[in-house]
From Swiss-Prot:
Lineage: Eukaryota, Metazoa, Cnidaria, Anthozoa, Hexacorallia
Protein name per its UniProtKB record: Delta-actitoxin-Ael1c
Function (record text): Modifies current passing through the fast sodium channel (Nav) in neuroblastoma cells, leading to delayed and incomplete inactivation. Paralyzes the shore crab (C.maenas) by tetanic contractions after intramuscular injection.
GO cellular component: extracellular region; nematocyst
Domain of life: Eukaryota
Species the sequence originates in: Anthopleura elegantissima
Pfam families attached to this UniProt entry: Toxin_4
Molecular function GO labels: sodium channel regulator activity; toxin activity
InterPro entries in the record: Anenome_toxin (IPR000693), Myo_ane_neurotoxin_sf (IPR023355)
Residues making up the signal peptide according to the UniProt record: none
Location(s), subcellular: Secreted; Nematocyst
């Protein structure tokens, strides 16, 4: 998957670890959305 920025990673991509994974169809089973204001399509999820 594509790495994405969780809320816990910091305010922006610069200098922060991207600990989430971007899923186009939403978070798979056992994962949770880790970004409150995500893109309109897909979700930034964490295991």
């Amino acid at each position: 998957g594509v790495p994405c920025l969780c809320d816990s990673d910091g305010p922006n991509v610069r200098g922060n670890t991207l600990s989430g994974t971007y899923w186009l169809a939403g978070c798979p089973s056992g994962w949770h959305n880790c970004k409150s204001s995500g893109p309109l399509i897909g979700a930034c999820c964490k295991q």
